[in-house]
């Protein structure tokens, strides 16, 4: 928390509540998240570059066809609060979450200076992809030029592929044990949950 006077622009925020459902429509959990209102950001003050790639649907279909041809299995992994795992590359100031406001001695509310990404900011997706990409490349994964959200790795366990859609990861590999090893790698960097073998991928069954 910092005094409001230190912030060239204060980004407003809001609580976003959501019901996350499983592929069969049943409720998995209820979520509440404090998000920035990105429309209140000012260009060249709060952000400059904002583009972040996500895997194309045509690439997903191509990966699944390749998996079927080479007997690979599609597994899923989900990174918990992904945007908050990446360092914030800009100086961003956001108002405090409503209901949890702290004031200075003069009665003025402090503002939050972000150290990590926050959902709703324009560059959060870019910062997250940059952080994930750095970890994957360091581990030997190769980013594909045709679709920068696809990565591959050749090793003793055979060829593996990743398809990245924000915080959802499609992992093609030969067995559950290989997938578990990948999830362990992810957990050493970001809290990650395995979704097991997939039958429902980005709206496609």
Feature map (PLM): residue ranges:
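Long, low-complexity, charge-biased intrinsically disordered regions
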Residues: 1-205
């Amino acid at each position: 928390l910092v005094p409001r006077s230190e912030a060239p622009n204060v980004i407003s925020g809001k609580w976003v509540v959501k019901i996350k459902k499983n592929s069969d429509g049943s409720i998995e959990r209820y979520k509440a998240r404090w998000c920035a209102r990105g429309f209140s950001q000012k260009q060249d003050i709060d952000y400059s570059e904002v583009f972040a790639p996500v895997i194309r649907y045509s690439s997903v279909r191509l990966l699944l066809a390749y998996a079927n041809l080479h007997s690979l299995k599609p597994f899923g992994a989900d990174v918990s609060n992904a945007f908050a795992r990446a360092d914030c590359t800009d100086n961003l100031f956001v108002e405090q979450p409503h209901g949890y406001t702290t004031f200075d001695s003069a009665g003025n509310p402090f503002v939050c200076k972000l150290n990590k990404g926050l959902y709703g900011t324009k560059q959060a997706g870019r910062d997250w992809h940059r952080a994930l990409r750095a970890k994957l490349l360091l581990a030997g994964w190769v980013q594909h030029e045709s679709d920068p959200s696809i990565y591959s790795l050749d090793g003793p366990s055979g060829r593996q592929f990743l398809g990245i859609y924000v915080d959802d990861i499609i992992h093609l590999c030969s067995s559950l044990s290989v997938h578990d090893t990948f999830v362990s790698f992810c957990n050493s960097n970001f809290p990650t949950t395995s979704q097991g073998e997939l039958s429902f991928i980005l709206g496609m069954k």
